[in-house]
Structure formats: structure tokens, C-alpha cells
Amino acid sequence: HLLSEALGLSSTGRDCLLCYRELVHALIRSGVYPATAQAVYGLALLLERGILYQPPVAPAMWRQLNLQLSEWAEARLSLAYGEVASPRARLIEGVLCMLGLPLGVGQGNNPTCQSARALSMWAYNDPDYLLQMVTWAARDDEIIMHFEGQPISSNESVSGVAAELPMDLDPVSLIVVPHLDRIYAEMGRRCIGREGDPHRWVNPEFHGWWSGRGFSINVDVATGKLCEVDTFIRHFYASYHPYYNGNQPLIHPQPAGIAVTDSAARFIGWHAITILRASLDPNDVMRIYFYNPNNDSGQDWGDGVKVSTSGNGERFGEASLPFEQFTSRLYIYHYDPLERGELATVTDEELERVKGFLNRSWGATRLPSTDLQADPGPR
């Protein structure tokens, strides 16, 4: 009773604590120290999520408690966090926090948004798979994933997106991201020579089976110009907007790519995010709620597009935008190709509003040329 009160648990968390009392006590003994106080918060939220009821998770947590860390993993954790707590305790703290706060994973000051997104997605949607990744990276110094049936070893991949080993990360990311980054880059290299954007093939293989195999992009890869914008928008509405998809909620989180802009609506770069859900906010405005791994979700993207993190129906860790504004910054999304694919009958007014936000921001310099020629006149 005292423990559940100290953790501030609801009836859900208390029931989970009662069912897995021995495991929880072992996690506290191994991972909670004055230097790892955040583990308490992570543990409380893990119990509130009820994920220990998933059959593989509790055995995987016992494995984590007894995991023998490699010398490389111990050195990385000690270098980043010091010697006040053991590397094992630091990693347990990191696991508890990532499983308790899956939308709190950050990429730090590193170009590793794809890897951060994958860790968040696994913690959110497939926690035992995340624990398997942690085991491989921390114990074996190697992760092997498959791309179109062929194995890719993180040890055999040449290099990743990040030029240097990132250090400003949580304990799990510190150990796992270097491996994921190299594998992600290798998957991209295996797409060289294919026509189109490599994310079409990489994202479903890298993130998980639930990532839609259907793929839509509104930028011509060869020229960088906008292409088929109307179809792109109508298909996105048909796939994600409750008013156009039969009021079907999003079942699994989906990877997507956005064109990030600054407060003057100028293009900064491409960025990986996760679409979590679409729903009406308290003011009856349809919004997209998403996860942004860049540690700064509440950003001003210019032209009145201001990302919200609270006050508009966001759950903890979510960012959100009105559906139209989000669509205007979107350049890649996935969908299930087996779903009915009729384009949404979006009104011309709404379509023009989305295109207006697009053309006034990152699309301003990407408008396709019209190739108009002057009439030579009569001869």
C-alpha cells in the first residue's frame, strides 16, 4: 500500500503492481538510487500503462535485470553519466523511463530523428521488441535487422547518418542509437539506383510491420519540385481524416516526413515524425496529434502555423496542429495499400487553404514551372 501511494498509482497501476510485485521490487532494488531518481517516475508510468500484462514483457524485464553489459556499453554509460550509479542501474533507469514515457524520447543535438522515432514507436507499440533491441546492443555490441529478407549487421555497416557518436542522449538511446543509425543508413544505401524516395522501402522494414506499405510523396525526387499535390492531399484525407475514412481511428502509429519551417515560414529541412491519431479538439477543430523527436515540439513554423503541446486535447508528450496546417507541412506519409483507396472529396475551399499554407512556406521555391511560351503569332 505504501509503495502504491508513493508512486501515485491509480487503480490500474495498483493492480499491475499487485500482479508483478516481485518484479517491481527487483526493479527498484536494481535501478532506483538517488542518482537515478527519474526511474521512480518511469516505473510509475510503466505500471499505469499496464504493459506488464503483455505476455513477453515481464520475462523480458527479468532478462534486463540480469543482463551482462559489454565493456563498450559500460564505458559509454560511465562516460556520459559518471560513476555515481552503476552502468547497469543507469540502463534500467533508461528502460523504465522509455517504457513509461514513450513519447519522451529525444534525439538530442544529433541528426538521428529516424532512430529516435523508432525507439519511441517500439516503446509505444511493441515494448518487448524494444527490450530485445536493448539486449542485443548492450550485451552483444551488435544489432541485426533484415531488409527485404537480407540481414544487416550494425557492425558491418560502414557509417550512419551521424558523423560522431552522439552523447547527449538518454541511457537507452546512448547504447542503441549508434547501431540503429548505421543500419538505417545501410538500408538507404541498398536503395541506391531505385527510382523515387528510399523511405518508401526503408521505413516499413526499419520501423515494423505495422508501417503502411503504401507510400505517398508530393516532391519529385529528381527535381525537388512539388508534384501531384492535389492527389497527395486528397489521399491523405481519405486515409487519416475521420470525416473521410469512415470514422476509422488510426490503429498503429505511422511514420511520416515533414518539411520543417522557421517562424518566417522558410524551409529548414526534412524531419521524421510519427502520426499518432486524428481527433476533434475541445473546440471541435479536427487536429493531427503527432510525436516529434526533436526535444522542442512547441514550435512556430511561420504563417500562423504554431505547434501546440497542451490545451488542445494533447495527451502527455504529443504535439498537434489543425488538420489543414499539418497537411501543408507534410511531404511523406504511409498508408495501407489494401484499404479502399478512393480520393477524399475534399471541398475546393479546404484544398485551397492547405495549398495556400504550402505555397506560402516551404513550397514557395518548389512550384513546378508552367512552361508557358509566348504565342509566335500569325506567319
Model-identified regions with their sequence ranges:
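Long amphipathic alpha-helical scaffold segments
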Residues: S4, S11-V105, P111
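Active-site signature of cysteine proteases
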Residues: L17-R21, N218-R379
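Generic low-polarity alpha-helical segments
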Residues: L23, A39-V40, A58-Q64, A185, ...
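A residue-identity detector for tryptophan
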Residues: W62, W72, W122, W136, ...
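Hydrophobic, Leu/Ile/Phe/Ala-enriched alpha-helical segments that form helix-helix packing faces
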Residues: L65, L69, R117, M121-W122, ...
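Glycine- and small hydrophobic-enriched segments that form the cores of compact globular domains
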Residues: A75-E186
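Papain-like cysteine protease catalytic cores
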Residues: W136-G246, L250
